[in-house]
Amino acid sequence: MRKLFTSESVTEGHPDKICDQISDAVLDAILEKDPYARVACEVAVTTGLVLVMGEITTKCYVDIPKIARDTIREIGYTRAKYGFDADTCAVITSIDEQSPDIAMGVDKALEAKLGEMTEDEIEAIGAGDQGMMFGFACDETPVLMPMPIYLAHKLARRLAYVRKEGILPYLRPDGKTQVTVEYEDDKPVRVDTVVVSTQHSPEVTHAQIEADVIEHVIKPVIPEGMLDKNTKIFINPTGRFVIGGPQGDSGLTGRKIIVDTYGGYARHGGGAFSGKDPTKVDRSATYAARYVAKNIVASGLAKKCEVQVSYAIGVARPLSIRVDTFGTGKISDEKIAEIVKRVFDLRPAAIIRDLNLRRPIYKQVAAYGHFGREDLDLPWERTDKVGEILKEAQNV
């Protein structure tokens, strides 16, 4: 049976992604000086204005306006004619401390207060919020990500590359990509549709943009065997995309959570990542759930795996762990869930310890996806638990 699935990505110059990158640049700058800081940093951008707000508790000082401007400059908004300029935009900051009501639950977990867990056993941190998080992996690509989002990200990164390297100098920072993949019996067989929208300078013709994007962006990214004469390609389908970035649309941190994860191919708990320190389970537990799912697929126990984990604020142990292999598991989902509980410690402090998350590693994943990154060595992308999983699988 044939079916289609579509995922989208955006470039680093998209207004929402500008915000994600500034939020994570602030987080990284603080974690570099104070690894135990509490950070919840949100950003909004609009024409000529950046607003940085949130709750930050730290012993260090960072120059937030400078971090914001440097990030905008790196993205490529360096001239007013691009609709946004790192040097002339206004930067307003409004920062408070973390609520003491939240801090009391995170500083010392409920289990530690009740004496169930010694301080020596693990630094006892309760979850920073309630909620449920999902992790996913499948064997469609070498990085164990779904193919539609994998290709959409590669196209978006390629757009930025040809712009920054001067291959297509008329391109500007804002842009979006979208890929529709056709599946036969649950395996990707061809690319049905590609959509690329890219901001550009006013003097270039639509015909030139179309020809150049096909030649320098689409062909180098989409595997040759996946494109055919019936593949539909849409490039700047409105015909013009000169006004873009924060001048075209306002942006907010955390509005691209599907782009950040699996492109809609797997479920999402609703929590965003950027600007949050690792005591926030929205971020750390979602990374851990990806780590679990990826190791299960890498071990060969399933072709597809989705892991759900849930928490209560101030409580360290997960309330629930659920595994769904969509009928692809070599053993039952319940048995795999048992293996997960034995192999992985999903208490927030253990996640932070095992994945070494109190480091400035976040800005690099704030654009082009937090998962399946071939260009980065991310701890939650490692498949170093396969041996333990297979050993436990013999005992269940």
Swiss-Prot record:
PANTHER family: S-ADENOSYLMETHIONINE SYNTHETASE
Name of this chain's protein: S-adenosylmethionine synthase
Pathway of action: Amino-acid biosynthesis; S-adenosyl-L-methionine biosynthesis; S-adenosyl-L-methionine from L-methionine: step 1/1
Keywords: ATP-binding, Cytoplasm, Magnesium, Metal-binding, Nucleotide-binding, One-carbon metabolism, Potassium, Transferase
Disulphide-bonded residues: none
GO BP term, example: one-carbon metabolic process
Family: Belongs to the AdoMet synthase family.
Chief location category: cytoplasm
Amino-acid positions noted as binding ATP in the UniProt annotation, renumbered to this chain: 14, 174-176, 240-241, 249, 255-256, 272, 276
Organism: Caldicellulosiruptor bescii (strain ATCC BAA-1888 / DSM 6725 / KCTC 15123 / Z-1320) (Anaerocellum thermophilum)
